[in-house]
């Protein structure tokens, strides 16, 4: 009887582990350009002005100079049918990041995100910020640790995964927020990133916020190392460049007992 109970418990544990592995592995099969949001995710940009106004706002950081409604424009998709979002807000002309960046009104801790972008011109520059803190660079022509696809200053640029100018690209990310105990940081934030279906960063620890106070939440705290236990939205950066976005969706997660790898 004891052996039967043990066998039953072991089988249940195995089944649970298999389900978790299958769930994560199934994510890897539903990534890249054109990936559709799962039922448990929320769409944050579907090409409409209505959704932009409903779910996004300007990030009002220390350098903020915009004025609502958001001045990012809705334009025709240059590749496929439909409309997309252009990050070229006139307020940010000349590379003035932080003046007209947009962020989701909803804030997050752990999440999975899908963002598609297209850079039409050489040197096109924007950025995707996890929890309005940690930037995944969007910058044509730069393959350094500050370049395209890099978790800025934390990893090398996976430039090899880039589809190139005038083509759609996709970031698929699972992010785990920093953990705190009694108000003290005990675990740094981590992320796994796929770039156009290729895994480029695996369960990568993120040490700090880079770029100073105009970059995002906590950017001005102890040189970006003073991370606080505050959730943040998904932010897109305006630097006065034509960078297009579409098909943005986010799935909230609870990764207390799991890595970000998938």
Describe the residue ranges of each PLM region.
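Carbohydrate-interacting regions of secretory-pathway proteins
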Residues: 24-262
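Generic short amphipathic/hydrophobic targeting helices enriched at N-termini
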Residues: 5, 16-17, 27
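Bacterial N-terminal signal peptides that target proteins for export
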Residues: 1-13
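Intrinsically disordered/low-complexity terminal segments and short unstructured peptides
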Residues: 6-7, 21, 82
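Bacterial N-terminal signal peptides
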Residues: 10-23
